[in-house]
Design a protein with these regions (language model features):
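C-terminal accessory region of radical SAM enzymes
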Residues: 156-192, 222-274
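Short cysteine clusters
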Residues: 42, 46-49, 202, 220, ...
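Processing junctions and N-termini across compartments
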Residues: 36, 40-43, 196, 258-261
Length: 299
Protein backbone atom coordinates (compact mmCIF):
# COMPACT_ATOMS: atom_id res chain seq x y z
CA UNK A 1 0.00 0.00 0.00
CA UNK A 2 1.06 3.59 -0.61
CA UNK A 3 -0.21 6.46 1.59
CA UNK A 4 -0.27 9.06 -1.19
CA UNK A 5 -2.18 6.72 -3.50
CA UNK A 6 -4.63 5.92 -0.69
CA UNK A 7 -5.32 9.63 -0.13
CA UNK A 8 -5.77 10.35 -3.85
CA UNK A 9 -8.04 7.34 -4.26
CA UNK A 10 -10.21 8.49 -1.37
CA UNK A 11 -10.50 12.01 -2.79
CA UNK A 12 -11.47 10.64 -6.20
CA UNK A 13 -14.09 8.37 -4.61
CA UNK A 14 -15.59 11.21 -2.55
CA UNK A 15 -15.64 13.55 -5.53
CA UNK A 16 -18.20 11.32 -7.26
CA UNK A 17 -20.94 12.33 -4.83
CA UNK A 18 -19.50 15.53 -3.32
CA UNK A 19 -19.06 17.24 -6.68
CA UNK A 20 -21.57 15.39 -8.85
CA UNK A 21 -24.63 14.92 -6.63
CA UNK A 22 -25.42 18.59 -6.21
CA UNK A 23 -29.00 19.60 -5.44
CA UNK A 24 -30.33 23.16 -5.82
CA UNK A 25 -32.93 24.04 -3.19
CA UNK A 26 -34.66 27.42 -3.27
CA UNK A 27 -31.96 28.66 -5.59
CA UNK A 28 -28.89 27.65 -3.59
CA UNK A 29 -26.64 24.57 -3.67
CA UNK A 30 -27.14 22.21 -0.76
CA UNK A 31 -24.14 20.69 1.01
CA UNK A 32 -23.09 17.27 -0.23
CA UNK A 33 -20.91 16.26 2.73
CA UNK A 34 -22.18 16.38 6.31
CA UNK A 35 -19.91 15.07 9.02
CA UNK A 36 -21.38 13.89 12.32
CA UNK A 37 -19.46 13.72 15.57
CA UNK A 38 -21.57 11.11 17.36
CA UNK A 39 -19.55 10.80 20.54
CA UNK A 40 -16.85 12.85 22.21
CA UNK A 41 -14.47 10.06 23.15
CA UNK A 42 -11.84 7.99 21.38
CA UNK A 43 -10.08 4.85 22.54
CA UNK A 44 -6.86 5.94 20.83
CA UNK A 45 -4.49 8.87 21.25
CA UNK A 46 -2.77 9.44 17.89
CA UNK A 47 -0.03 12.07 17.97
CA UNK A 48 -1.34 13.83 14.85
CA UNK A 49 -4.82 14.18 16.38
CA UNK A 50 -5.88 16.83 18.93
CA UNK A 51 -7.30 14.00 21.05
CA UNK A 52 -3.70 13.28 22.04
CA UNK A 53 -3.78 16.41 24.24
CA UNK A 54 -6.46 16.41 26.93
CA UNK A 55 -6.00 20.15 27.38
CA UNK A 56 -7.16 20.69 23.80
CA UNK A 57 -9.65 17.89 23.16
CA UNK A 58 -10.50 16.01 26.35
CA UNK A 59 -12.82 13.00 26.26
CA UNK A 60 -16.14 14.22 27.65
CA UNK A 61 -18.06 11.01 26.80
CA UNK A 62 -21.00 13.12 25.59
CA UNK A 63 -23.00 11.53 22.79
CA UNK A 64 -25.59 12.46 20.19
CA UNK A 65 -29.16 11.48 21.06
CA UNK A 66 -31.78 9.80 18.91
CA UNK A 67 -33.95 12.92 18.73
CA UNK A 68 -31.24 14.79 16.84
CA UNK A 69 -30.66 11.84 14.50
CA UNK A 70 -34.39 11.59 13.79
CA UNK A 71 -34.62 15.33 13.08
CA UNK A 72 -31.62 15.25 10.76
CA UNK A 73 -33.01 12.28 8.85
CA UNK A 74 -36.39 13.99 8.37
CA UNK A 75 -34.84 17.21 7.14
CA UNK A 76 -32.52 15.48 4.69
CA UNK A 77 -35.48 13.62 3.19
CA UNK A 78 -37.43 16.88 2.88
CA UNK A 79 -34.47 18.53 1.14
CA UNK A 80 -34.03 15.56 -1.24
CA UNK A 81 -30.41 15.43 -0.12
CA UNK A 82 -28.12 13.51 -2.51
CA UNK A 83 -24.75 13.76 -0.79
CA UNK A 84 -23.25 11.77 2.06
CA UNK A 85 -23.31 11.75 5.84
CA UNK A 86 -19.99 10.73 7.35
CA UNK A 87 -19.92 9.30 10.86
CA UNK A 88 -16.54 10.28 12.30
CA UNK A 89 -15.90 13.75 13.75
CA UNK A 90 -14.19 14.25 17.10
CA UNK A 91 -14.49 10.68 18.38
CA UNK A 92 -14.73 6.99 17.49
CA UNK A 93 -18.26 6.45 16.11
CA UNK A 94 -18.45 2.73 16.87
CA UNK A 95 -18.25 3.53 20.59
CA UNK A 96 -21.78 4.96 20.37
CA UNK A 97 -24.17 2.31 21.67
CA UNK A 98 -26.84 3.37 19.13
CA UNK A 99 -24.57 3.09 16.09
CA UNK A 100 -26.83 0.57 14.34
CA UNK A 101 -29.96 2.65 14.93
CA UNK A 102 -28.16 5.80 13.79
CA UNK A 103 -26.88 4.16 10.63
CA UNK A 104 -30.25 2.65 9.75
CA UNK A 105 -32.13 5.89 10.38
CA UNK A 106 -29.76 8.09 8.38
CA UNK A 107 -29.50 5.55 5.55
CA UNK A 108 -33.17 6.22 4.79
CA UNK A 109 -32.20 9.77 3.89
CA UNK A 110 -28.63 9.65 2.67
CA UNK A 111 -25.53 7.76 1.77
CA UNK A 112 -23.82 6.88 5.09
CA UNK A 113 -20.08 6.42 5.43
CA UNK A 114 -18.48 5.31 8.68
CA UNK A 115 -14.84 6.06 9.48
CA UNK A 116 -13.38 3.93 12.26
CA UNK A 117 -10.10 2.73 13.72
CA UNK A 118 -11.67 -0.74 13.81
CA UNK A 119 -10.60 -1.52 17.37
CA UNK A 120 -14.07 -2.46 18.62
CA UNK A 121 -15.17 -3.91 15.30
CA UNK A 122 -15.95 -7.60 14.88
CA UNK A 123 -17.56 -9.60 12.08
CA UNK A 124 -21.03 -9.42 13.67
CA UNK A 125 -20.91 -5.63 13.97
CA UNK A 126 -19.61 -5.38 10.41
CA UNK A 127 -22.55 -7.45 9.18
CA UNK A 128 -25.01 -5.41 11.27
CA UNK A 129 -23.70 -2.15 9.82
CA UNK A 130 -24.05 -3.54 6.31
CA UNK A 131 -27.59 -4.74 7.06
CA UNK A 132 -28.36 -1.26 8.43
CA UNK A 133 -27.58 0.01 4.91
CA UNK A 134 -24.30 1.78 5.57
CA UNK A 135 -22.75 2.64 2.19
CA UNK A 136 -19.10 2.25 3.16
CA UNK A 137 -17.05 1.25 6.17
CA UNK A 138 -13.64 2.91 6.10
CA UNK A 139 -11.12 1.34 8.47
CA UNK A 140 -8.01 3.33 9.33
CA UNK A 141 -5.23 0.89 10.24
CA UNK A 142 -2.71 2.52 12.58
CA UNK A 143 -0.78 -0.46 13.94
CA UNK A 144 0.82 -1.90 10.83
CA UNK A 145 0.29 -3.97 7.66
CA UNK A 146 -0.39 -7.05 9.80
CA UNK A 147 -3.88 -5.61 10.35
CA UNK A 148 -4.79 -6.25 6.73
CA UNK A 149 -5.04 -10.00 7.31
CA UNK A 150 -7.19 -9.48 10.41
CA UNK A 151 -9.72 -7.27 8.65
CA UNK A 152 -9.83 -9.34 5.47
CA UNK A 153 -10.76 -12.34 7.60
CA UNK A 154 -13.42 -10.22 9.28
CA UNK A 155 -14.84 -9.29 5.88
CA UNK A 156 -14.94 -12.95 4.87
CA UNK A 157 -16.56 -14.07 8.13
CA UNK A 158 -19.19 -11.34 8.00
CA UNK A 159 -20.04 -12.22 4.38
CA UNK A 160 -20.33 -8.58 3.35
CA UNK A 161 -19.26 -7.55 -0.18
CA UNK A 162 -15.56 -6.80 -0.49
CA UNK A 163 -16.22 -3.28 -1.74
CA UNK A 164 -18.27 -2.43 1.36
CA UNK A 165 -15.06 -2.08 3.37
CA UNK A 166 -12.15 0.21 2.51
CA UNK A 167 -8.88 -0.50 4.33
CA UNK A 168 -6.70 2.58 4.70
CA UNK A 169 -2.99 2.42 5.53
CA UNK A 170 -2.36 4.84 8.39
CA UNK A 171 0.59 3.16 10.11
CA UNK A 172 3.35 5.39 8.76
CA UNK A 173 5.70 7.55 10.81
CA UNK A 174 5.94 11.32 11.05
CA UNK A 175 8.25 11.48 8.03
CA UNK A 176 5.35 10.27 5.86
CA UNK A 177 2.79 12.40 7.70
CA UNK A 178 1.34 9.26 9.33
CA UNK A 179 -0.32 8.36 6.03
CA UNK A 180 -3.00 11.04 6.39
CA UNK A 181 -3.78 14.33 4.66
CA UNK A 182 -2.07 16.18 7.49
CA UNK A 183 -3.23 19.61 8.63
CA UNK A 184 -2.66 21.67 11.76
CA UNK A 185 -6.35 21.33 12.64
CA UNK A 186 -6.89 25.07 12.45
CA UNK A 187 -3.76 25.88 14.43
CA UNK A 188 -4.38 23.23 17.08
CA UNK A 189 -1.37 20.96 16.48
CA UNK A 190 2.08 21.23 14.95
CA UNK A 191 3.52 17.87 13.98
CA UNK A 192 4.80 16.28 10.77
CA UNK A 193 5.57 18.10 7.53
CA UNK A 194 3.01 20.84 7.86
CA UNK A 195 2.53 23.13 4.88
CA UNK A 196 2.90 26.86 5.41
CA UNK A 197 -0.23 28.62 6.61
CA UNK A 198 -0.94 30.80 3.59
CA UNK A 199 -4.20 32.67 3.16
CA UNK A 200 -5.81 30.90 0.25
CA UNK A 201 -9.28 30.14 -1.04
CA UNK A 202 -11.23 27.44 0.80
CA UNK A 203 -14.37 25.68 -0.44
CA UNK A 204 -15.22 23.87 2.80
CA UNK A 205 -18.21 26.04 3.81
CA UNK A 206 -19.49 25.93 0.23
CA UNK A 207 -20.18 22.19 0.30
CA UNK A 208 -19.92 20.78 3.82
CA UNK A 209 -20.20 21.23 7.57
CA UNK A 210 -19.92 19.26 10.82
CA UNK A 211 -22.62 18.59 13.41
CA UNK A 212 -21.36 17.96 16.95
CA UNK A 213 -22.97 15.59 19.47
CA UNK A 214 -25.16 18.38 20.92
CA UNK A 215 -26.35 19.72 17.57
CA UNK A 216 -23.87 22.58 17.26
CA UNK A 217 -22.93 23.14 13.62
CA UNK A 218 -19.34 24.00 12.69
CA UNK A 219 -17.76 25.11 9.42
CA UNK A 220 -15.74 21.94 8.99
CA UNK A 221 -13.91 19.19 10.91
CA UNK A 222 -10.75 21.32 11.17
CA UNK A 223 -12.23 23.36 14.05
CA UNK A 224 -11.27 21.01 16.86
CA UNK A 225 -11.46 23.76 19.46
CA UNK A 226 -15.08 24.42 18.52
CA UNK A 227 -14.46 28.14 18.32
CA UNK A 228 -17.27 29.31 16.03
CA UNK A 229 -20.72 27.71 15.88
CA UNK A 230 -22.91 28.42 12.87
CA UNK A 231 -26.07 27.46 14.76
CA UNK A 232 -27.65 24.49 16.52
CA UNK A 233 -29.61 21.69 14.85
CA UNK A 234 -31.95 21.28 17.83
CA UNK A 235 -33.02 24.92 17.62
CA UNK A 236 -33.01 25.53 13.85
CA UNK A 237 -33.33 23.52 10.67
CA UNK A 238 -30.37 22.63 8.47
CA UNK A 239 -31.31 24.84 5.56
CA UNK A 240 -31.76 27.98 7.66
CA UNK A 241 -28.33 27.44 9.23
CA UNK A 242 -26.80 26.73 5.81
CA UNK A 243 -28.01 30.02 4.28
CA UNK A 244 -27.72 32.00 7.51
CA UNK A 245 -25.51 35.05 8.20
CA UNK A 246 -22.75 33.12 9.98
CA UNK A 247 -22.17 30.73 7.11
CA UNK A 248 -22.52 33.56 4.60
CA UNK A 249 -19.79 35.60 6.28
CA UNK A 250 -17.24 32.78 6.30
CA UNK A 251 -18.24 31.47 2.89
CA UNK A 252 -17.79 34.85 1.22
CA UNK A 253 -14.46 35.53 2.91
CA UNK A 254 -13.05 32.10 2.09
CA UNK A 255 -14.16 32.29 -1.53
CA UNK A 256 -12.00 35.41 -1.71
CA UNK A 257 -9.09 33.70 0.04
CA UNK A 258 -9.56 35.83 3.15
CA UNK A 259 -8.75 33.64 6.15
CA UNK A 260 -9.14 36.51 8.58
CA UNK A 261 -11.27 35.06 11.40
CA UNK A 262 -10.92 32.13 13.78
CA UNK A 263 -10.68 29.26 13.16
CA UNK A 264 -9.65 29.96 9.56
CA UNK A 265 -6.81 32.41 10.15
CA UNK A 266 -4.70 29.71 11.81
CA UNK A 267 -5.69 26.91 9.43
CA UNK A 268 -3.39 25.44 6.77
CA UNK A 269 -5.88 22.98 5.26
CA UNK A 270 -5.91 22.79 1.47
CA UNK A 271 -9.55 23.66 1.04
CA UNK A 272 -9.94 23.41 -2.72
CA UNK A 273 -9.55 19.67 -3.28
CA UNK A 274 -13.33 19.21 -3.44
CA UNK A 275 -16.34 21.46 -3.89
CA UNK A 276 -15.36 23.51 -6.93
CA UNK A 277 -18.84 23.29 -8.46
CA UNK A 278 -20.45 24.49 -5.25
CA UNK A 279 -17.96 27.34 -4.95
CA UNK A 280 -18.69 28.52 -8.49
CA UNK A 281 -22.42 28.60 -7.81
CA UNK A 282 -22.01 30.46 -4.51
CA UNK A 283 -19.84 33.06 -6.23
CA UNK A 284 -22.60 33.68 -8.78
CA UNK A 285 -25.20 33.93 -6.03
CA UNK A 286 -23.24 36.44 -3.98
CA UNK A 287 -22.32 38.40 -7.09
CA UNK A 288 -26.01 38.67 -7.99
CA UNK A 289 -27.25 39.66 -4.54
CA UNK A 290 -24.49 41.81 -3.15
CA UNK A 291 -23.03 43.50 -6.19
CA UNK A 292 -26.10 43.92 -8.37
CA UNK A 293 -24.50 42.08 -11.25
CA UNK A 294 -25.96 39.31 -13.32
CA UNK A 295 -25.52 35.98 -11.63
CA UNK A 296 -27.50 32.89 -10.75
CA UNK A 297 -31.19 33.67 -10.74
CA UNK A 298 -32.86 32.84 -7.44
CA UNK A 299 -36.38 31.43 -7.64
Amino acid sequence: MNPEKTIKKNLKRRSVFVDNELVIHKGVPLPTWIELSLIDVCNRSCSFCPKSDENIAPDTHQKMNRALIDKLSRELIELKFKGAVALCGYGEPLLHKDIIYITEKLAKASRVEIVTNGDVLNFKMMKNLYDANASRLLISMYDGPQQIKKFKKMIKDSKVPDDFVILRDRWYDEGKNFGVKLTNRAGTINIGNQIKNIHTTCYYPSYQFLIDWNGDVYLCPQDWQRRVSMGNMMQENIFDIWIGPSFRKFRMNLLKGRRIDNPCKSCNAQGTLLGQTHASLWRKIYKYFFYGKKGLEIN
